[in-house]
Amino acid sequence: MALGGGTFTSQNKELPGAYINFVSAASASAALSDRGIATMPLELDWGVEGEVFEVTNEDFQKNSLKLFGYAFDSPKMLGLNDLFMGAKTLYAYRLNGGGDKAANTYATAKYCGVRGNDLKIVIQKNADDASKYDVTTYFGTVKVDTQTVAKAADLVANDYVTFKAADLAVTAGTPLTGGTNGTVDGTAHQAYLDKIESYTYNTMGVVVTDDITKKLYVAFNKRLRDELGIKFQLVVYNLSADYMGVISVKNKVTDAGWSEAALVYWVTGAESGCAVNKSCQNKKYDGGFTVDTNYTQN
């Protein structure tokens, strides 16, 4: 019974008729699963080499210096800041590993890369015990570690350097030098794809401008989607892929020191966090890059 009869809850109705309650199970979430998981291969000045490593939004804000070599609000982190505006978790891979580690008489950088050249070791006599030294590690202008020891053998490796068995001597600051980034080539991109294939993520983004590398990623996307049933979206820059699994970003970035394809960061994050019953169409860009929007109607 509907309308005047009301909804049946107990045998207290006055109007005759059939009262039927329809109770359905809780509907499935439109999200289907936790979204906001992205993956990207990155060119970095510091960080883990040869492995996929997980970074959450919280990790990025709290441990960006340790993970990427720069504070999260550094201009060098502009791309990742854009990514984490939409993403919750990033599976990152460093493309340019395999370079040289910076070093000096007392220590060697934990990772290769030019950022290691901004490390320095300061050694002072301990104020309370003249037989001991205060050994301080600086990353840029940030003090990241201090240890008080009698000899170098007592020093423990920290998140930035490993120490050598050298004779300690007072120094106002001995910089580490010789750090270099590795070379990015097709082999590095393929190594990333081999590593990431076993992971689960919503969106993959790659910041490149050459069509050969873009097509390598498109082929990977098609194989996983069509042959293995693993559905994810690939974000690339300015490529007519004509495929439902690929998102092509047309607008270019004009900021000095950044690839014109850098808007891929923001789109990758936004798409990864977008629910399956929603769309990023007409979503306003609110990231930190300067975007070329000087287009005509045709």
Where are these regions (language model features)?
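A glycine- and small-residue-enriched flexible loop/hinge signal that marks low-structured segments
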Residues: L3-S24, A28-G47, V52-T56, F60, ...
